[in-house]
């Protein structure tokens, strides 16, 4: 057998290809000659130092495909190529699918919400857009038109009202005939005038109350009852038999603490 030191001679580089021994060497024994004859072609594997040091790599051979698999691949290739070719060529297939799904979703949403289309009790009332108009107070249809009094009639009515606020039937008939008015017109005018006078009187009383309110502090009350002898003496003066002089209360005493016990007397 050949020694392992001769491996470099047996293998050739990638460019030379596989090396084959030419013939039987002049070996001493017949066994070595027969072994060398039976040697087969050795594949070129870069196991030498020079091959390992260099960056050259052997070309990778494509694996052999069995004939059965090759025939099956040839049959399947025409079936797969049209689909892949269309997909690689930017086919509108993936673009059409979102529209189809969107249309299906919209149809499903319409089918899933029938209460929106059906005018049932859950449907919102339709809104009628109308121009914004100022809504005025509607008067009664059978309301009589307002009487346009003249200046002389108004002056005569005011003078009569100051003399007498309530007129009898005879006085009202005579007064209405003198002013060329009906009794109903005079009657209604006096009613409205009395209501106006009442409102004015209430407003005057309210003004007087507001004017007199700051004079006394809030929550202030007299430290003694109204029906006490001291209060009666101050009211009636010397005519009261048990008259006692009333001492004047200083202004500071109004806000002092001893007066506070009568705060809730009149409340």
Swiss-Prot record:
One of its GO terms (cellular component) is cytosol. Residues 142-201 bind DNA. It is found in: Nucleus. Its main location: nucleus. Induction: Up-regulated by BMP2. GO terms for biological process: activation of meiosis; anterior/posterior pattern specification; BMP signaling pathway; bone morphogenesis; bone trabecula formation; branching involved in mammary gland duct morphogenesis; cartilage development; cell surface receptor signaling pathway involved in heart development. Keywords: Developmental protein, DNA-binding, Homeobox, Nucleus, Osteogenesis, Repressor, Transcription, Transcription regulation. Residues 1-42, 104-132 are annotated as: Disordered. SMART domains: HOX (SM00389). CDD domains: homeodomain. GO terms for molecular function: DNA binding; DNA-binding transcription repressor activity, RNA polymerase II-specific; RNA polymerase II cis-regulatory region sequence-specific DNA binding; RNA polymerase II transcription regulatory region sequence-specific DNA binding; sequence-specific DNA binding; transcription cis-regulatory region binding. The keyword Aminoacyl-tRNA synthetase does not apply. It comes from the Eukaryota. The keyword Transcription regulation applies. Expressed in mesenchymal tissue in the developing spinal cord and limbs. Interacts with MINT. Interacts with XRCC6 (Ku70) and XRCC5 (Ku80). Acts as a transcriptional regulator in bone development. Represses the ALPL promoter activity and antagonizes the stimulatory effect of DLX5 on ALPL expression during osteoblast differentiation. Probable morphogenetic role. May play a role in limb-pattern formation. In osteoblasts, suppresses transcription driven by the osteocalcin FGF response element (OCFRE). Binds to the homeodomain-response element of the ALPL promoter. Belongs to the Msh homeobox family. This is Homeobox protein MSX-2. It comes from Mus musculus (Mouse). The lineage of its organism: Eukaryota, Metazoa, Chordata, Craniata, Vertebrata.
């Amino acid at each position: 057998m050949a020694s392992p030191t001769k491996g470099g001679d047996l293998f050739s580089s990638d460019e030379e290809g596989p090396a084959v021994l030419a013939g039987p060497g002049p070996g001493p024994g017949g066994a070595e000659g027969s072994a060398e004859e039976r040697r087969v072609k050795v594949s070129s594997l870069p196991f030498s130092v020079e091959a390992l040091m260099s960056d050259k790599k052997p070309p990778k051979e494509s694996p052999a495909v069995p004939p059965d698999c090759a025939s099956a691949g040839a049959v399947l290739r025409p079936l797969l190529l049209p689909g892949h070719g269309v997909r690689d060529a930017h086919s509108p297939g993936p673009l059409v699918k979102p529209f189809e799904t969107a249309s299906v979703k919209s149809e499903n949403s319409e089918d899933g919400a029938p209460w929106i289309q059906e005018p049932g009790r859950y449907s919102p009332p339709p809104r009628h857009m109308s121009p914004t108009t100022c809504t005025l107070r509607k008067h009664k249809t059978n309301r009589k038109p307002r009487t346009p009094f003249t200046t002389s009639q108004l002056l005569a009515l005011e003078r009569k009202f100051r003399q007498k606020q309530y007129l009898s039937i005879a006085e009202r008939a005579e007064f209405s005939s003198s002013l060329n008015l009906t009794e109903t017109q005079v009657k209604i005018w006096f009613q409205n005038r009395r209501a106006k006078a009442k409102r004015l009187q209430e407003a005057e009383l309210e003004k007087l109350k507001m004017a007199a309110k700051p004079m006394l502090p809030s929550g202030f009350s007299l430290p003694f009852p109204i029906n006490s002898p001291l209060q009666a003496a101050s009211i009636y003066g010397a005519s009261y038999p048990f008259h006692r002089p009333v001492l004047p209360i200083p202004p500071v005493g109004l806000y002092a603490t001893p007066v506070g016990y009568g705060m809730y007397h009149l409340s």
